[in-house]
C-alpha cells in the first residue's frame, strides 16, 4: 500500500495499546429527552447549530430536517437532493447549512428560509462528508467515494482545490479550528493532514494493521486527532509526535458502519461539570458510549432500546420516563453523534429501521458504594 508524503508508522508508539475498558461504576448518566421521528430511512448525520438552538438531521430519505433543539418540534424540511444525504454542516454563524449526498453533489441552504442557494458539483461519486472552516466560514471541505478531498469557496461556488487524497472512499474531512489544516480519513486505513493553502500532505498516520478509518476530527485545541476505526476502537492521535495517545474500546461496537464521535464536557461545553472530559461515540448495538478522554475508561452509556426494556444500560436511560424523559433508545445502530455547543446534550441518529433522532441529557452520578 502506498503511504504517500509525510508517512509516520504508528507501530513504534503503542504505549497505551491496552488500557482498562471501564470503571467499576459509570459516572455519567444519559437520559433521552427527545425521540424525534419523521425520517423514513437511516439518519446518517446530526449536527447542532453553532448557537445550539437548532438541530439538523440528514437522512437516506433524501431530506434534511431542522428541529427546535429545546422543544423537539420540526421547524423545516430541506428537500432537493435526488439521493440520500450523508452529511450536514453548519457555517460558523448558523445562517447557512451545507449538505453532502449520494447524488455526487453538495448543496448550500439558507437555514432560515429553507431555500437552496447553490449546488456544488464536481465529485464523480457519492459525497460522503463535508465541513465548514471554523474561522470565516468561507471554505467548505468535502470528501467522496471518488477518493478525493475538495475545497470550495462557498461565496462563489468554485472548487479551489481537488486533492487525490486516498486510495479508498474518504469518510471524513474536517478543518482545524483556525482553518489552516484539514484532516481526512479513509477506508484505506489512513488519516492524512493537509495544508489548506497549498493542498500539500503534512502527515500520514496509520496503524500496523491499518483498519478502515470511519471518522476523524481535530480536538477543539487542534493538538490531537480523534478517529474511529472499524475494529471497534476510537483513538486519540498526537499527530505532531506521530503516535497514539489513547485508545478507547470496550464500550461500543463498530465493525460495519461509519460512526462519528464527539467531545463532551470540555471547552466546548464548559458551562457544566461532568467530572471529566469525554469522548462520546455511537455503537452498532444501538447504544451511546462515553469514555474518559484521559484514562480511556467507559464512564457512561445511553442504553439501546432492548437494553432499556430489560433494565440494562445506565440508570439515566432506564429511569427516563420517570424523570420526564423518553423511555428506551435506538433500535438499530447509532450512526451519528453530535454534542451541543454549550449544554450537556448529545444528539444521535439511528440506522434503518430505527430512523430516529434522539437527544440525550448527560448528568454526573455518584458511583455506588462497593
UniProtKB/Swiss-Prot annotation:
Protein name as annotated: Protein Mut11
Task performed by this protein: Part of a complex involved in 'Lys-4' histone H3 methylation.
Region called Disordered, residue ranges: 1-22
InterPro entries per record: G-protein_beta_WD-40_rep (IPR020472), WD40/YVTN_repeat-like_dom_sf (IPR015943), WD40_repeat_CS (IPR019775), WD40_repeat_dom_sf (IPR036322), WD40_rpt (IPR001680)
UniProt family annotation: Belongs to the WD repeat WDR5/wds family.
Subcellular location: Nucleus
Keyword flag Repeat: yes
Superkingdom in the source lineage: Eukaryota
SUPFAM superfamilies per UniProt: WD40 repeat-like (SSF50978)
UniProt-listed Pfam families: Beta-prop_WDR5, WD40
Key words, A-Z: Nucleus, Repeat, WD repeat
Gene behind the chain: Mut11
Spans of repeat WD: 38-77, 80-119, 122-162, 165-204, 208-247, 262-301, 329-370
Disulfide topology: none
CDD domains for this protein: WD40
Disruption phenotype: Loss of monomethylated, an increase of dimethylated and a decrease of trimethylated 'Lys-4' histone H3, and defects in epigenetic silencing.
GO cellular component, one term: transferase complex
Keyword Kinase on entry: no
Amino acid at each position: 500500500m502506498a503511504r504517500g508524503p509525510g508517512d509516520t508508522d504508528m507501530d513504534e508508539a503503542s504505549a497505551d495499546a491496552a488500557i482498562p475498558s471501564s470503571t467499576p461504576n459509570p459516572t455519567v448518566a444519559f437520559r433521552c429527552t427527545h425521540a424525534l421521528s419523521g425520517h423514513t430511512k437511516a439518519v446518517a448525520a446530526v449536527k447542532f447549530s453553532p448557537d445550539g438552538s437548532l438541530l439538523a438531521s440528514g437522512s437516506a430519505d433524501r431530506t434534511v430536517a431542522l428541529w427546535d433543539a429545546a422543544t423537539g418540534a420540526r421547524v423545516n424540511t430541506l428537500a432537493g437532493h435526488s439521493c440520500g444525504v450523508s452529511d450536514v454542516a453548519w457555517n460558523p454563524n448558523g445562517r447557512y447549512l451545507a449538505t453532502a449526498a449520494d447524488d455526487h453533489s453538495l448543496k448550500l441552504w439558507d437555514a432560515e428560509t429553507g431555500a437552496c442557494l447553490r449546488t456544488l458539483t464536481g465529485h464523480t461519486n457519492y459525497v460522503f462528508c463535508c465541513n465548514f472552516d471554523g474561522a470565516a466560514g468561507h471554505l467548505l471541505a468535502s470528501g467522496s467515494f471518488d477518493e478525493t478531498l475538495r475545497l470550495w469557496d462557498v461565496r462563489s461556488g468554485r472548487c479551489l482545490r481537488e486533492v487525490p487524497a486516498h486510495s479508498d472512499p474518504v469518510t471524513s474531512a474536517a478543518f482545524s479550528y483556525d482553518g489552516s489544516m484539514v484532516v481526512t480519513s479513509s477506508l484505506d486505513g489512513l488519516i492524512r493532514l493537509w495544508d489548506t493553502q497549498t493542498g500539500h500532505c503534512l502527515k500520514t498516520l496509520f496503524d500496523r494493521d491499518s483498519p478502515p478509518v470511519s471518522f476523524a476530527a481535530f480536538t477543539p485545541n487542534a493538538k490531537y486527532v480523534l478517529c474511529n476505526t472499524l475494529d471497534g476502537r476510537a483513538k486519540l492521535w498526537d499527530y505532531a509526535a506521530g503516535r497514539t495517545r489513547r485508545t478507547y474500546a470496550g464500550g461500543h461496537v463498530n465493525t460495519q458502519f461509519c460512526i462519528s464521535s464527539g467531545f463532551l464536557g470540555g471547552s466546548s461545553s464548559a458551562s457544566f461539570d461532568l467530572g471529566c472530559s469525554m469522548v462520546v461515540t455511537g455503537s452498532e448495538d444501538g447504544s451511546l458510549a462515553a469514555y474518559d478522554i484521559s484514562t480511556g475508561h467507559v464512564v457512561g452509556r445511553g442504553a439501546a432500546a432492548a437494553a432499556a426494556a430489560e433494565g440494562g444500560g445506565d440508570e439515566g436511560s432506564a429511569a427516563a420516563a420517570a424523570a420526564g424523559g423518553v423511555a428506551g433508545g435506538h433500535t438499530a445502530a447509532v450512526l451519528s453523534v453530535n454534542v451541543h455547543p454549550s449544554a450537556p446534550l448529545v444528539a444521535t441518529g439511528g440506522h434503518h429501521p430505527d430512523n430516529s433522532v434522539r437527544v440525550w441529557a448527560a448528568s454526573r452520578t455518584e458511583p455506588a458504594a462497593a
